[in-house]
């Protein structure tokens, strides 16, 4: 590995999924993993294998299917964790074990209730054990941003001696500033005698909005792996945004003088995919991938861009993969055109899924005069997000109007039995403050789950009076947030689909937890 190559370590499937409501099923995680591989991500952190059986299976499956990127699993500094992690990632062509252990006095004393000497011993022993299983082992010094510098350097030196191939310096709580963090990386590079035997990595959180700036400062001072997520998602205020780092290094390559192997024209597709699967919308003014990233309203700016794009644009839409034109399909479009458009949009789907999507496309095309790219993407994401469904919407009728009480009637199929092979149809009606509220109350009567709607948003997927509407929502069940989304030309139907998807996610997670 050349010393001036930046390694992109994507943790969307692990840290990114810790955003409330951002949990994904196995099918969705595979979609993201395949797209990250298409983007050219060097390392995909697929999950935390010991945290749940679902996470273990996801990491194992991704390890078996992705062949171009290294696949990492996160684990604590314990032999049990490391063994479980290895059992999940060992199927990968390029597996990595990622061990973390806190090094700040606050965490050592308050959380772990240990001494510095004990932490140093744990770090060395667990790295050696990890190395006995896997040749690629990463060590993360949790809360390095607030760790004593002398002790941090001592730990870094010791774990490299023990066999760590990458040492990660996280700003776990997003506390440091760019100058501070850059100086910390520079000091590690200067003081640790064996530092050149490992890659120095950084993992910055965005609590003060400085994650990208801190990561860039780290690059200037010798860090060569950046841990990040698509759209910057993650717990609390999120993580370093992969697309912002990638395009900064591309646009300002003469300043940073480093290289990377990402295919930046896949950034837009990757951003859209993650947004749709997690239910976390990208703000319109988000750098690089936001809807307004290449929009110009000022007359002076518009005039300049028309004369020479570089007057007000430092990068082109094509650099990040924004489609130059939207291909319009309709009810007369055939399989070939539809399948080709799906491929052009960056999706790799099996023949059975493609045929199923084509049938859904024809139904939509009968309702809409024109079907745009965003309509097709919405169909794909809705279809691939379903997972195992306990409840399926069969019928919906909702009425409302001036001077009338909104009412709704729904019929839902409920799968029963251990293998969900039997189903019964249930019906309920309810009144509400509006047609969506009435629909949700009718659904609640059937599902018999104490689920609470916490967030609801509706947007038009495409243009025109017959536009496809997309509802994205979050619902809480037994203390956990689940996301749901639904699309339809009927916004009441889209709302019902989104609610039922969140309910199915909650039911699946809770049943798995109970071992059903």
From Swiss-Prot:
Pyruvate carboxyltransferase domain mapped to chain residues: 6-268
Subcellular location: Cytoplasm
EC number: 2.3.3.13
Catalytic activity: 3-methyl-2-oxobutanoate + acetyl-CoA + H2O = (2S)-2-isopropylmalate + CoA + H(+)
Region named Regulatory domain: 392-516
MF terms in GO: 2-isopropylmalate synthase activity; acetyl-CoA C-acetyltransferase activity; manganese ion binding
Pathway(s) of this molecule: Amino-acid biosynthesis; L-leucine biosynthesis; L-leucine from 3-methyl-2-oxobutanoate: step 1/4
Residues engaged in binding Mn(2+): 15, 203, 205, 239
Entry GO terms, CC: cytoplasm
InterPro entries documented for this protein: 2-IPM_HCS-like, 2-isopropylmalate_synth_dimer, AIPM/Hcit_synth_CS, Aldolase_TIM, LeuA/HCS_post-cat, LeuA_allosteric_dom_sf, LeuA_bact_synth, PYR_CT
Cofactors named for this entry: Mn(2+)
Main localization (coarse): cytoplasm
Gene Ontology process terms (BP): L-leucine biosynthetic process
CDD domains cross-referenced by the UniProt entry: DRE_TIM_IPMS
The entry's keywords: Amino-acid biosynthesis, Branched-chain amino acid biosynthesis, Cytoplasm, Leucine biosynthesis, Manganese, Metal-binding, Transferase
Enzyme class: transferase
PANTHER family named among the record's database cross-references: 2-ISOPROPYLMALATE SYNTHASE 1, CHLOROPLASTIC-RELATED, HOMOCITRATE SYNTHASE-RELATED
HAMAP family: LeuA_type1
Subunit note: Homodimer.
Family: Belongs to the alpha-IPM synthase/homocitrate synthase family. LeuA type 1 subfamily.
Function: Catalyzes the condensation of the acetyl group of acetyl-CoA with 3-methyl-2-oxobutanoate (2-ketoisovalerate) to form 3-carboxy-3-hydroxy-4-methylpentanoate (2-isopropylmalate).
Annotated protein name in UniProt: 2-isopropylmalate synthase
Organism name: Endomicrobium trichonymphae
